[in-house]
Amino acid sequence: MNKFFYTVLIIILSIYQGFSQFTPADVQTNSILLYGGSLHIGNGEVIEKSAVGFKDGKIIESVDIEYNQIDTSYYDIVINVTGKEVYPGFIAMNSTLGLMEIGAVRATKDYRETGKFNPNSRTLTSFNTDSRITPTVRSNGMLIGQISPRGGIVSGTSSVMRFDAWNWEDAVVRADEGIHMNWPKNRVNNNVNNELDIEKVKSKVKHTQNEIHDFFQIAKAYVQKNSLTIDLRMEAMRDLFIGKKRLYVHADKVSQIKEIISFKKEFNIEKLTIVGGKDAHYIPELIAENEISMIVSRVHSLPSYRQSELDISYKLPSILNKAGVLFCFDNQGDMEQMQSRNIPFLAGTAVAYGLPYEEAIKALTSNCAEILEISNYGLITKGKSATLFVSEGDALEISTNKISHAFIDGRRIDLSNSQEKNYLKYCKKYGLIPEK
């Protein structure tokens, strides 16, 4: 009986999901010109009256129409975006979007593997292009993302994916671009007040650090030796030691960051990014000196300590920017898949607390592309991918972020989603908005 019930339930859910899926956009066949909009290039510059033309998925011109004559007849489609804002597609960093659909169902959680060391665990093939959450994220300007693993000590490898595709092969922008590791926390709970328990915590942290060092030493020796015996975990680490992969270390405390800097030097790791870094405001110059980039997690969060300034999380991006640290934003934490849509508003809060506006745009676009080494994205300049969107107002402000057009590699994206459809459905039912 139970088997029959579950079989019927799976069939019903499959049919329901089939009807609810959005069809990916077709490859660009017509040349398109966005005319008259205020263009945020993604490099800190703005063109108040711009023309952006793209063909075959590539930008062919990006100019100021006050100083350049544009032949609009060259284009198959001309879209007047006067009075609107044009941005490069925002990039969701350190995201688990597409790796989990229903939090209460363990079988849908594809972002975590069992065990401590899983560098060969790939998010690439687990990415679900049919997630019902993805369209809700796209409609706020998040068009591509770094899909990252969680759990263990070495969690696995992340990949960069498009948020409109038929399958993971179709979605991939850059496969297996980095390895994620969780640095141990030297954390003692407030209710632990005897020295024996404190020493136990410190001993556990030291043991984990030793495990990390041992694993990296074995991996480095494996790479140098070129063993005939294939070890998949060690093979996944190979590109890290030759500078082809980036190491993302998840950590928040000053002590952790200092330990990570020493670790970077010890193993001669060329590319390293700290994810989280809540206490980075204490040592921004040290981070910059060691050429470490940062993914700032959840600007909308409380400070770590009672004595901290209440708004220090909001100020952190500005502090890092002044120190010359390359940084970007993520929304790691509770309900992070659906919360990815709010990443632009984290940047907006940072602007209100001292970060220059165009630096905030860079932290959502070109900074991300630089860290991920996807040079085709993050800028609206000639030769780059036509991954961009048009907003009726400021895209970093909740009340004015209203996307009218979006393109991924020149393909015009469907911006509707199930939540918006339900909103309009019930507004219409109760006469809250006029019928269109």
Name each model-derived stretch:
Residues K49, Y222-I312, E370, E392, ...:
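Active-site core of metal-dependent hydrolases
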Residues G37, V52, G57, G83, ...:
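Divalent metal-coordination and catalytic microenvironments
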Residues F22-D26, L39-A51, D64-N68, M338, ...:
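Acidic, glycine-enriched loop/beta-strand segments at the rims
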